[in-house]
Amino acid sequence: MFPLGVLKKEQVGSVGVLRLSLPFATNATDTSGNAIPTRTAQGTPTYSSGSLLLDNDDVIATGTTDGQVQSSLNTVGKGWQLEFDVKMIATEYRGILYKSIYTSVGFPCLYLEQSTGLLRLRSYLNQDVFTVNVGLDMSAAFFNVKIVQTANTDYPKLYINNNLIATCLFGGDLFGDSSNQAGFVFGTGSNSTGFKIKNFKFYTT
């Protein structure tokens, strides 16, 4: 069964406590107050006009080394919310972020594809949480993506520019069942055009 229910538009506030805040205006420093370390895992990311360009093989990741757990980013048994502003450069399918402490792990992940307007979110078990057309030109301007799972047992909801677009039809620990998912990785990690990102925030209950 296609795991989406398209709903009426509505507004949403923040869920839980801010754990990670990466404005990506001039660097990848966490401004949440939790001092979560980040690093350039590969490539040469570019900061310009208040945003981060992740192009070619550029990758930004939490932790000072690969595989370093950030316990406050663990979502096991919790509700969570993530949000960010993004503008696509590539027209093809691109990985925007991965919920992992390892740069080589492919899931959980969020993908965007400018040519079709599709957003895809896959769980740590590679389940299809969302596959939905966001209904706008991803390259025209920055747009806001917000995904909220209020509690572990609730169904995640997808908001675009603060308007509810869709809801998943199942809940659970979609973002992982261990500390292996207690981190984030940003970037395509491949020799291709990418995207611009800013104002990333992550909350847990």
Task: Please describe what each predicted stretch is.
Residues 1-23, 201-205:
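Enriched but not universal
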Residues 168-196:
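Flexible glycan-contacting loops in extracellular carbohydrate-active proteins
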Residues 121-144:
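Short, aromatic/His-centered strand-loop micro-motif at the edge of beta-sheets
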Residues 9-13, 55-80, 130-136, 188:
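Short surface loop/edge beta-strand patches of beta-sandwich-type extracellular domains
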Residues 140-150, 156-158:
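Short tryptophan-centered beta-strand motifs in secreted/extracellular beta-sheet-rich domains
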Residues 95-121:
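Glycan-recognition/cleft segments
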Residues 20-49, 54:
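Short, tryptophan-glycine- and acidic/Ser/Thr-enriched carbohydrate-recognition patches
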Residues 67-90, 106-109, 200:
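A carbohydrate-recognition surface predominantly in extracellular/luminal proteins
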